C-alpha cells in the first residue's frame, strides 16, 4: 500500500524494496506489515518466481506541492517527509482509465472524480489521467469516514483524549484505526448492511 517518497511506480520486490516497505509500516500499519508476510510466503512457496510490489501511493505522486504539503513547519517535510501520499491509487487509476475508454474516448483533456468505497474509502481528482488531489493523507487514516477509521478531524482530539483517558498516543491511534468510523459511530458494525438492519430495527445511532 504505502510506498512513501520512494516509489512512483511498481518495483521489483528485492531487498531494497523490502527494506523500504518495512520502514514505512508506521504509515500503513494495517497493510505494509501484512504484505511483507504475504511476500515471504510466496517467496518460500515459489522461490524461482519473481515478485513485484504495486504501491497504492504511486498514482498520487503526480500531485503538486500545493496539494500534498501540510500547513505545518516545513522542516517536518524536509526531515521526515511528512506530506499527503494518498492511497487506493491502483483503484483510482483503473477507474480513471476505464472511464476514459468508455465515456471520454474523443476527449484530449478531461476531468474525473473517482471514488473507492470499501471498509477503507477515498476520493481522487484526476486531470488528463493524472491525480491532482486525493482525500487520504500521510496514512490511510485520513480523508472521509471509513469502516473502522476516523477520517479527517481536529488534530487536537488526540491530545485531548490522551489527557482525559490517561491512554497513550499509540492506544488512541489504534482506536482511531480499528474502533472508529462507522463502527465507532454506530456501535454495531463497520458493515453498512448491519447498520442498515439496525436502522430498521430502531437503533438510533
Residue ranges and their predicted role:
Residues 18-23, 73-80, 196-203:
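Gly-rich Lys/Arg/Thr-decorated short loops/hinges at beta-loop-alpha junctions or inter-strand turns
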Residues 12-15, 33-38, 45-48, 107, ...:
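Non-transmembrane, aqueous-exposed alpha-helical and coiled segments at domain scale
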Amino acid at each position: 500500500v504505502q510506498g512513501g517518497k520512494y516509489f512512483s511506480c511498481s518495483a521489483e520486490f528485492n531487498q531494497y524494496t523490502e527494506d523500504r516497505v518495512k520502514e514505512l509500516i508506521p504509515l500503513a500499519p494495517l497493510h505494509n506489515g501484512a504484505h511483507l508476510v504475504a511476500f515471504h510466503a510466496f517467496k518460500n512457496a515459489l522461490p524461482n518466481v519473481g515478485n513485484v510490489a504495486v504501491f497504492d501511493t504511486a498514482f498520487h505522486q503526480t500531485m503538486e506541492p500545493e496539494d500534498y504539503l501540510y500547513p505545518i513547519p516545513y522542516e517536518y517535510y524536509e526531515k521526515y517527509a511528512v506530506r499527503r501520499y494518498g492511497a487506493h491509487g491502483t483503484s483510482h487509476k483503473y477507474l480513471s482509465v476505464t472511464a476514459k475508454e468508455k465515456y471520454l474516448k474523443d476527449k484530449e483533456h478531461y476531468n474525473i472524480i473517482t471514488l473507492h468505497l470499501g471498509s477503507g474509502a477515498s476520493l481522487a481528482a484526476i486531470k488528463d489521467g493524472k491525480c491532482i488531489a486525493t482525500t487520504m493523507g500521510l496514512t490511510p487514516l485520513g480523508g472521509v469516514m471509513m469502516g473502522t477509521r476516523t477520517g479527517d478531524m481536529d488534530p487536537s482530539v488526540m491530545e485531548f483524549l490522551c489527557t482525559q483517558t490517561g491512554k497513550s498516543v499509540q492506544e488512541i491511534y489504534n482506536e482511531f484505526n480499528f474502533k472508529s468510523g462507522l463502527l465507532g459511530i454506530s456501535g454495531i458494525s463497520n458493515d453498512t448492511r448491519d447498520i442498515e438492519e439496525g436502522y430498521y430495527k430502531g437503533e438510533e445511532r
